[in-house]
Amino acid sequence: MTNRMELSGTVVKDPIRSQSPAGISHCRFWLEHRSVVVEADLPRQVFCRMPVVVSGKGSQDITQQIVLGSNIKVSGFVAYQTGRNGVGKLVLHADDIIHI
């Protein structure tokens, strides 16, 4: 099975950096993507906002320059997470981020 996603866009919420009780570093932010793609031979405007999380000891190096308004390309895998309020969402777990 394959679970790989690449998405470019703009950081639209300030990154939140934290550390788990086990000492694992995390950085969470929201990425907004806008583009035009061709579907059924017609141009279609595409928009999405997706939460992104970067975890692990290398996360600080990858995310230290990410701020509100950064234009980046994120690669990673997608997982479903349920929040404390019971509402679920897809989250992009990034392992590579490039500033564009």
UniProtKB/Swiss-Prot annotation:
GO terms for biological process: DNA replication, synthesis of primer. SUPFAM superfamilies: Nucleic acid-binding proteins. Residues 1-100 form the SSB domain. The keyword DNA-binding applies. GO terms for molecular function: single-stranded DNA binding. The keyword DNA-binding applies. Pfam families: SSB_1. Keywords: DNA replication, DNA-binding, Primosome. GO terms for cellular component: primosome complex. InterPro entries: NA-bd_OB-fold, Primosome_PriB/ssb, Prisomal_replication_PriB. Homodimer. Interacts with PriA and DnaT. Component of the replication restart primosome. Primosome assembly occurs via a 'hand-off' mechanism. PriA binds to replication forks, subsequently PriB then DnaT bind; DnaT then displaces ssDNA to generate the helicase loading substrate. Involved in the restart of stalled replication forks, which reloads the replicative helicase on sites other than the origin of replication; the PriA-PriB pathway is the major replication restart pathway. During primosome assembly it facilitates complex formation between PriA and DnaT on DNA; stabilizes PriA on DNA. Stimulates the DNA unwinding activity of PriA helicase. Belongs to the PriB family. This is Replication restart protein PriB. It comes from Vibrio vulnificus (strain YJ016). The gene is priB.
